[in-house]
Amino acid sequence: DGESIYINGTAPTCSSCHDRGVAGAPELNAPEDWADRPSSVDELVESTLAGKGAMPAYDGRADREDLVKAIEYMLSTL
């Protein structure tokens, strides 16, 4: 499920930065952190695949379907 992918997915895991806001990563349960981010899952997946700021590109390293599940989980906390 999305939460398990968020915690245990492709390294570096989503949780390693988004749990604590490392390097400007928007945190879970913090809608204000996400205000200037794309709101659609597709846009966030594309951003994740390409990499953004300190976040490395996950293209070729993570399954797109897994990214969708992890991002849907993250958005569900807002």
Curated annotation (Swiss-Prot):
<feature type="binding site" description="covalent">
    <location>
        <position position="14"/>
    </location>
    <ligand>
        <name>heme c</name>
    </ligand>
</feature>
<feature type="binding site" description="axial binding residue">
    <location>
        <position position="18"/>
    </location>
    <ligand>
        <name>heme c</name>
    </ligand>
</feature>
<keyword id="KW-0349">Heme</keyword>
<dbReference type="InterPro" id="IPR002323">
    <property type="entry name" value="Cyt_CIE"/>
</dbReference>
<feature type="binding site" description="covalent">
    <location>
        <position position="17"/>
    </location>
    <ligand>
        <name>heme c</name>
    </ligand>
</feature>
<keyword id="KW-0479">Metal-binding</keyword>
<dbReference type="GO" id="GO:0020037">
    <property type="term" value="F:heme binding"/>
</dbReference>
<dbReference type="Pfam" id="PF13442">
    <property type="entry name" value="Cytochrome_CBB3"/>
</dbReference>
<dbReference type="InterPro" id="IPR036909">
    <property type="entry name" value="Cyt_c-like_dom_sf"/>
</dbReference>
<dbReference type="GO" id="GO:0009055">
    <property type="term" value="F:electron transfer activity"/>
</dbReference>
<keyword id="KW-0408">Iron</keyword>
<protein>
    <recommendedName>
        <fullName>Cytochrome c-551</fullName>
    </recommendedName>
</protein>
<keyword id="KW-0249">Electron transport</keyword>
<dbReference type="InterPro" id="IPR009056">
    <property type="entry name" value="Cyt_c-like_dom"/>
</dbReference>
<keyword id="KW-0813">Transport</keyword>
<feature type="binding site" description="axial binding residue">
    <location>
        <position position="55"/>
    </location>
    <ligand>
        <name>heme c</name>
    </ligand>
</feature>
<dbReference type="GO" id="GO:0005506">
    <property type="term" value="F:iron ion binding"/>
</dbReference>
